[in-house]
Amino acid sequence: MAARKTAKSARSTKKTKRAPARAKAKAAPRKSGNGGDSLALRSASPSFTVNDLDRSLGWYRDILGFAVEETWKDDEGRVMGVSLKAGDVSFMIGQDDWKKGRDRAKGEGFRIYCETRKSVDDLAKRIESNGGRLDSGPTNQPWGVRDISLTDPDGFKITIARAR
């Protein structure tokens, strides 16, 4: 019996080896604990700097059907920016002020993705009848939407989609 106790005692005091900290798998990103509400954001409205505000405003208003929600003028009364709205979506376009560094190419690497409750086919017909040109669509996508894509006068890409 004494031998048994000794073996048992030896087993219970045996230390287990742990992998070094650097060999552990990467930890998952830490959750904020507040459900992502640390900023208490209510909305987000992108703002695009455009080369010709009148041309862009006409395109969004007359081709796509956005409504002007608000305008901003400079000290001389020139419109320098507008807020546009269609349904629950709003964004702003503003005249490029041509300051150093602002003469960059517009619209590169950026796409506005909008979801609609309307028929994408009907929207495509309306856009084309208003003088707009589609880049693609209407197309059934493998992820379960039907969409159209177009490009505004400054190169910003827009996709309008509806779930099938």
Residue ranges and their predicted role:
Residues D154:
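C-terminal catalytic core of tyrosine-transesterase DNA break-rejoin enzymes
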Residues A3-S47, G58, I63-T151, A161-R164:
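Vicinal oxygen chelate
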